[in-house]
Amino acid sequence: MDNKENKLDEKKIFKNNKIEEKKENLIDAITVQNQKIENLKLKLLQNQKKINDIELRKLANIENIKKNTEEKIEKIKKTEIERFLKSIIPVIDSLEDILNLSTTVDIKDQPIIKGIELTLESLLNILNKLGVKIEGQKNKVFNPDIHELVSRELSKETLPNHVISVNKKGFTFNKIVLRKASVIVAEN
């Protein structure tokens, strides 16, 4: 029976070895699979970070486009308002010329002239409300940014380098010169 027991023991040992070997193989396979899972989790996190970065860049890009578009729209509005205001200036000049001429030919009291006076006054009031400033007042210091020098004259009533008279009014809008005032300035 010794031999039988030996063989049984050998079979048990062999069986146990096989089971151990299978366990080790299974543990190795599980370890490999766990490592693959960890690698996939890491890749997933990296991809999520990339996706988040891409989303943030897209949002930033959209904000930049929005901001640039708003700036362009504002610039266009400003340019068109400027262009419109510059086109109004000759109308003001014409109305003022008519009023000056009416005084010369003595028709200042005619109803049509009164209508022109009211029209000019209304137009200037509207422009004032919009922020347009009239430049070129008498006795103000000459400023080359808003005044165009027509000539210099001697004057006892006006201080040197001050405006004696205004040939044409100047206009500014939001610190933008629409037209410089044409002025005569007192000499030093």
Curated annotation (Swiss-Prot):
<dbReference type="GO" id="GO:0005829">
    <property type="term" value="C:cytosol"/>
</dbReference>
<protein>
    <recommendedName>
        <fullName>Protein GrpE 2</fullName>
    </recommendedName>
</protein>
<dbReference type="InterPro" id="IPR009012">
    <property type="entry name" value="GrpE_head"/>
</dbReference>
<dbReference type="GO" id="GO:0000774">
    <property type="term" value="F:adenyl-nucleotide exchange factor activity"/>
</dbReference>
<dbReference type="GO" id="GO:0006457">
    <property type="term" value="P:protein folding"/>
</dbReference>
<comment type="function">
    <text>Participates actively in the response to hyperosmotic and heat shock by preventing the aggregation of stress-denatured proteins, in association with DnaK and GrpE. It is the nucleotide exchange factor for DnaK and may function as a thermosensor. Unfolded proteins bind initially to DnaJ; upon interaction with the DnaJ-bound protein, DnaK hydrolyzes its bound ATP, resulting in the formation of a stable complex. GrpE releases ADP from DnaK; ATP binding to DnaK triggers the release of the substrate protein, thus completing the reaction cycle.</text>
</comment>
<dbReference type="InterPro" id="IPR000740">
    <property type="entry name" value="GrpE"/>
</dbReference>
<dbReference type="GO" id="GO:0051082">
    <property type="term" value="F:unfolded protein binding"/>
</dbReference>
<comment type="similarity">
    <text>Belongs to the GrpE family.</text>
</comment>
<keyword id="KW-0143">Chaperone</keyword>
<dbReference type="GO" id="GO:0042803">
    <property type="term" value="F:protein homodimerization activity"/>
</dbReference>
<keyword id="KW-0963">Cytoplasm</keyword>
<dbReference type="InterPro" id="IPR013805">
    <property type="entry name" value="GrpE_coiled_coil"/>
</dbReference>
<comment type="subunit">
    <text>Homodimer.</text>
</comment>
<keyword id="KW-0346">Stress response</keyword>
<dbReference type="Pfam" id="PF01025">
    <property type="entry name" value="GrpE"/>
</dbReference>
<dbReference type="GO" id="GO:0051087">
    <property type="term" value="F:protein-folding chaperone binding"/>
</dbReference>
